[in-house]
């Protein structure tokens, strides 16, 4: 919740409020672990009948994050996108980009996640632990040039560095994973290859609407991102599993 009137709030970016965010639901304000949730009506996006509430939850956080990054990258069909980290955000990026005709290279150290990425449309999958030289492996898949764009959804310093190094000249890298650090050679990794580095944090209400419409129109199976379902009284169990970061995405039903 922002001031509601500044340049960001008035364009659907309340989380970037010039005066500072007044309330963050689930952090400084009440969250959604209840049957109902009170929030500003002007932040809501009405879901179409062909989108489940479960998919809607993903669109608001996770799938929407991927959508925001892909939108910033301005990808075209037949270009190559390398996605580092295949949690819910990374897998969503694979699903959305693949549906746009983008050739996706999906990267993760977890074979189960790599297999899911393949089922969501990734053309190639790579496990960094099984590659002697990951950058060369990506170049081998792109006629020696490198990827047109990359998304890092892992927060791993090494993956972030690789997501830049794997790009061709004029490539674009987008970081969406929170926290962590990165070590890059500004001249060789960025300037002398004309690389664009983008930071993308969430997206606007209007972006949320566009994402929901696209998913419905393309009939993307966002529900398949979810691997677990719980009731509200199972929240403790849900968070214990979540902390292990070993599975996909879960949803808690309030009723």
Regions found by a protein language model. Give the residues of each.
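Glycine-rich phosphate/adenylate-binding loop and adjacent beta-alpha elements
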Residues: 1-44
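Mid-domain Rossmann-like dinucleotide-binding core that forms the NAD(H)/NADP(H) cofactor-binding site
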Residues: 42, 49-131, 136
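Structural detector of well-ordered beta-strand residues that form the stable sheet scaffold
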Residues: 45, 82, 105, 126, ...
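Structural motif
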Residues: 56, 84, 107, 153-154, ...
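Short strand-turn motif at the edge of the Rossmann-like AdoMet-binding core
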Residues: 154, 176-180, 200-203, 226, ...
């Amino acid at each position: 919740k922002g001031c509601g009137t500044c340049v960001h709030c008035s364009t659907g970016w309340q989380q970037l409020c010039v005066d500072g965010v007044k309330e963050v639901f689930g952090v400084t304000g009440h969250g959604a672990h209840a049957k109902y949730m009170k929030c500003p009506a002007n932040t809501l996006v009405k879901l179409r009948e062909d989108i489940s509430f479960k998919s809607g939850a993903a669109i608001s956080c996770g799938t929407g994050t991927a959508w925001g990054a892909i939108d910033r990258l301005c990808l075209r069909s037949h270009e190559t996108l390398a996605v580092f980290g295949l949690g819910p955000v990374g897998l969503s990026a694979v699903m959305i980009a693949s549906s746009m005709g983008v050739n996706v290279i999906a990267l993760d150290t977890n074979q189960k996640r790599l297999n899911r990425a393949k089922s969501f449309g990734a053309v190639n999958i790579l496990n960094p632990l099984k590659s002697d030289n990951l950058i060369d492996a990506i170049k081998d898949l792109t006629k020696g040039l490198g990827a047109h764009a990359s998304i890092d959804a892992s927060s791993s310093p090494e993956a972030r560095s690789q997501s830049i190094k794997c790009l061709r000249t004029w490539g674009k890298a987008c970081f969406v994973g929170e926290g962590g650090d990165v070590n890059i050679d500004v001249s060789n990794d960025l300037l002398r290859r004309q690389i664009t580095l983008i930071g993308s944090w969430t997206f606007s209400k209007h972006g949320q609407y566009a994402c929901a419409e696209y998913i419905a129109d393309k009939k993307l199976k966002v529900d398949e991102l979810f691997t677990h379902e719980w009731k509200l009284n199972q929240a403790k169990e849900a968070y214990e599993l979540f902390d292990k970061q070993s599975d996909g995405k879960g949803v808690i039903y309030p009723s």
